[in-house]
UniProtKB/Swiss-Prot annotation:
Keywords: Chaperone. One of its GO terms (molecular function) is protein folding chaperone. This is Prefoldin subunit 2. Heterohexamer of two PFD-alpha type and four PFD-beta type subunits. Belongs to the prefoldin subunit beta family. Binds specifically to cytosolic chaperonin (c-CPN) and transfers target proteins to it. Binds to nascent polypeptide chain and promotes folding in an environment in which there are many competing pathways for nonnative proteins. GO terms for cellular component: cytoplasm; endoplasmic reticulum; prefoldin complex; sarcomere; striated muscle dense body. It comes from Caenorhabditis elegans. Signal peptide: none annotated.
Length: 141
């Protein structure tokens, strides 16, 4: 609805509009949270991959150290490689699941947007609306 239509809406209609907008914002926030988690998981997976690339050619009995929480723990290369491979495999699975969730959340967001006829304003439209409201003029519907 335009600002003119919103001003003429009943309090019940305004409350319904507010709820629709809040739900849209919540869905968008959830989508952004999932995307951030995907990014974090992918970075962690790449980091494990880089470590694996570095140590795979070392002697199996060579010492290496791994930081677990705040403790540096001594291992041998042969003990760490399977753990790294397992971590990479698990992170790949989690990443795929999160990507699937991201796609589903995007579909849910688009459905909500279409169902409630939500249109995002461009920067220019937003500036014009703010300017018109500041001047006390209502924009064209």
């Amino acid at each position: 609805m335009s600002a003119a239509q919103t001003a003429a809406a009943t309090p019940a209609e305004q409350e319904e509009q507010r709820k629709v907008v809040e739900k849209f914002k919540a869905l968008r926030d959830q989508q952004q949270d999932i995307a951030a988690e995907v990014t974090r998981i992918e970075e962690e997976r790449r980091e494990f991959g880089r470590v694996l690339e570095v140590i795979k050619d070392l002697e199996p009995d060579q010492k290496c150290f791994r930081l677990i929480s705040d403790t540096l723990v001594e291992y041998t290369v042969k003990d760490v490689i399977p753990d790294l491979q397992n971590n990479i495999a698990n992170l790949t699975i989690v990443s795929k699941q999160l990507n699937d969730q991201l796609v589903e959340k995007g579909k849910e967001l688009n459905t909500h947007k279409t169902t409630h006829n939500i249109r995002l304003l461009t920067e220019k439209e937003s500036a014009e609306l703010r300017k018109a409201e500041a001047l006390g003029q209502l924009p064209k519907a």
